[in-house]
Amino acid sequence: LNHDILQSKSNTFLSAIHFNTSSKKKSEIGVSFLDVSTGEFLTSQGSSDYIDKLLQNFNPSEILFSKQKRKLFSETFGDNFHVFHLEDWVFQTDYATDTLNNHFKTNTLKGFGIEDISSGIIAAGAALHYLSETRHDKLQHIAKISRIAENEYVWMDRFTIGNLELYHSTSPNAVTLLDVIDKTISPMGGRLLKRWVALPLKNKDKIISRHEVVSYLLKNSKVLDNVKLNIKRIGDIERLISKVATGKVSPREVVQLKNSLEAILPIKEKAQKAKNESLKTIGEQLHNCKLLREKISVTLKEEAPVLIQKGNAISAGVSEELDELRSIAKGGKDYLNGMLKRETKRTGISSLKIASNNVFGYYIEVRNTHKDKVPEEWIRKQTLVNAERYITEELKEYESKILGAEEKIAALELDIFSKLVEWMLQFISQVQQNARLIGELDCLCSFASLAKESNYTRPLLDDTFEIDIKEGRHPVIEKQLPPDTPFIANDVYLDREMQQIIMITGPNMSGKSAILR
């Protein structure tokens, strides 16, 4: 979970592949995708063509498969992936099923809808096994596994994805479709939009439902602006709650999580009041996480540090013992300041300094020019090039008081924070649901903003075989034209009866491929 290497708007998927080489199902392959940073866990199975399309769409950072299947993997999917080989015994049905059931604390996988895809189960079990072997022992945020429904999406092969330049291009500095249409604000929205582009829906009702929300937001610009304003205040709560689960979250990140959850409240209110059923559903399903927000607010200071070891993270009033120790530490430091003033006056050494370091503790530093003024009872502790450092009985006494208090404060703050993080584990599913819903809402707001900015028109969808485009513009090419250069819009009509084929002619660079794309 190193956030320096994680791009906020991209998933970092680990994938596992299982080749079913039994006599009946030689062509069947299982696949799983797991993002430790977000908790997403997906599985499926099918032909090599289907699995190849999944790999192209999910673009995993690493793929696991059996050592014995190296040649088969290379022949089937090529050599352009970063791969890791596991022992063959990991890819057994019983072992994989037990691994998944033990992780999810279930007796069966029926509740996840994957019980009948044995190759997918084996691939999923291999991914979890690999994580357990690589010291990922805290995986409570991986709370469910979902089946990728093959018949719900339009599946594109690697050549189509490449030629359409949906979200990556082989050409340097090329602009992709995602670059043009991505108006998302949150990391969750950015990741989901990429998924939506990679996996276009086939279900007409689901597509129309998205269109209805976009239309509502376009007609109600105040709602759109208000929702976008509050989404801007929301951090990457999906990855933050994953860091809570893995125990790698900082005090500052916990406060960021609390502030993000507070920004969801006005969004929930607006969505619930909307005259659109999909938005209302989002509003109703968003959790207000009141108990979680209040606990964090009471326990941690708003300006909590990045590292708990820095101290001063826990609010006053949380622990009576902590408050008393802080009072002792502060009082001791005040005493040292008073001692400095007193000794400066007594010795006449104006440059006198009382300081401390990790090696020698507290000391009084005197420059060599004033060595003759040092009282006899001071004990030399360290000699420097231009100064001498001394200790006194009085300084020793207060050093032990201050350092003792500071050590206890550090231990107590760490204990309180650790208990808070452990207590927060019960809210993982609620925060994950909020992250998913905010991501969805962010994507829909992005579509509305894009439609408004680019003057896009809502398409009419039906079950006929007609394609009827009026004044169509290619979204990417249009944005790449020089300023004040209009895009020449084109009409396209195709159906099964009258016009099944059209012939496009013209010189080079006249826009033939733009029509095809």
Model-derived segments and their meaning:
Residues L1-Y216, D225, L229-K232, D236-A245, ...:
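Charged catalytic and DNA/RNA-contacting regions of genome-maintenance
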Residues I117, I185-S186, G190-W196, R367-K396, ...:
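ATPase nucleotide-binding head domains, primarily ABC-like/P-loop NTPase cores
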Residues V214, L218-S221, E399:
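A structural-propensity feature for long, helix-poor, extended segments
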Residues T246, S250, S260-A263, T281, ...:
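Charged, surface-exposed helical/loop "interaction arms" that form contiguous linear patches used
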Residues I267, L292, T299, Y362-W378:
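Cytosolic, long alpha-helical scaffolding segments
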Residues L384, E388-E422:
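Extended, charged coiled-coil "arm/hinge" scaffolds of SMC/Rad50-like chromosome-maintenance ATPases
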